[in-house]
C-alpha cells in the first residue's frame, strides 16, 4: 500500500479561469480543485512533475491521497482528471474530500 502526498498551493480568485489556468500550465503547474464535505471548495495548483509521478502508480486512483495546502492537510480521493488530447499530460484534477 503506497502513501501518496502531494504538495499544493492555494490559488486566489485572480488566478482562476481560462487565461489564468493556461498561464499556470505554461509554468508546469496543474490547476486543481478540492471539494466535498462540510468545508468550502479550495482551488489549488500542483506541480506537473509531482502529479505525473503519482499517476504512474495505478493505486493513486483507488487510495486516499494527502494533499498539503500550506500548513493544512486534506485527505482526498481523485474524482476526475482531464488530460491533453494529444500530449496526454494532466490539464486539471478534481479531488473529493474523503
UniProtKB/Swiss-Prot annotation:
Report the Pfam families cross-referenced here: Ribosomal_L25p
Q: Where does the sequence pass through the membrane?
A: none
Q: Does the keyword Ribonucleoprotein apply?
A: yes
Q: How does it assemble?
A: Part of the 50S ribosomal subunit; part of the 5S rRNA/L5/L18/L25 subcomplex. Contacts the 5S rRNA. Binds to the 5S rRNA independently of L5 and L18.
The protein's matches in InterPro entries, at most eight in alphabetical order, are given as: Rbsml_bL25/Gln-tRNA_synth_N (IPR020056), Ribosomal_bL25/Gln-tRNA_synth (IPR011035), Ribosomal_bL25_short (IPR020055), Ribosomal_L25_dom (IPR029751), Ribosomal_uL5_bac-type (IPR020930)
NCBIfam families membership = PRK05943.1
The protein in question is named Large ribosomal subunit protein bL25
**Gene Ontology annotations for the cellular component aspect, listed alphabetically:** cytosolic large ribosomal subunit
UniProt lists the gene as rplY
Amino acid at each position: 500500500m503506497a502513501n501518496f502526498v502531494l504538495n499544493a498551493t492555494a490559488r486566489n480568485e485572480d488566478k482562476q479561469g481560462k487565461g489564468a489556468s493556461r498561464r499556470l500550465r505554461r509554468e508546469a503547474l496543474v490547476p486543481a480543485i478540492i471539494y466535498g464535505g462540510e468545508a468550502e471548495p479550495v482551488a489549488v495548483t500542483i506541480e506537473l512533475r509531482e502529479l505525473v509521478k503519482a499517476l504512474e502508480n495505478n493505486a493513486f486512483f483507488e487510495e486516499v491521497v494527502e494533499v498539503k495546502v500550506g500548513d493544512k492537510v486534506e485527505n482526498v480521493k481523485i474524482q476526475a482528471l482531464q488530460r491533453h488530447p494529444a500530449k496526454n499530460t494532466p490539464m486539471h484534477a478534481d479531488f473529493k474530500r474523503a
